[in-house]
Amino acid sequence: MEKIDALTKTLLYEKAAVIHAAFEDAPTTVAFVEVEKNLSVDAKLEKAFVKTNSINDAWWNNEGVTKMFAGGACRSTSMGDMVLIGNTKYKCDI
């Protein structure tokens, strides 16, 4: 059953890479966020942004988020950071 679940997940979801660049010396990928393939680009970006912001808990504990940073903590995604969906990189500006 695990193979079927993995295949279904691959068909329905894609990973958005969240790249922190606003306050860093060099852009750094801090997370991969699972987003539904059928969502609009704006909805995928919104989901990646929300899921990498700490609200009630540390954002890296959110479901569908894969932590990619070293260490015990990482700031939330902010204006000036980027999200990569497919081959297109989007800058957080609102």
Range-by-range predicted roles:
Residues 8, 18, 27, 44, ...:
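Alpha-helical structural elements
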Residues 73-94:
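Short, compact, well-ordered microdomains
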Residues 35-66:
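Short, basic/aromatic beta-hairpin or loop at an interaction surface
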Residues 60-73, 78:
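A conserved acidic, glycine/proline-rich C-terminal tail/linker
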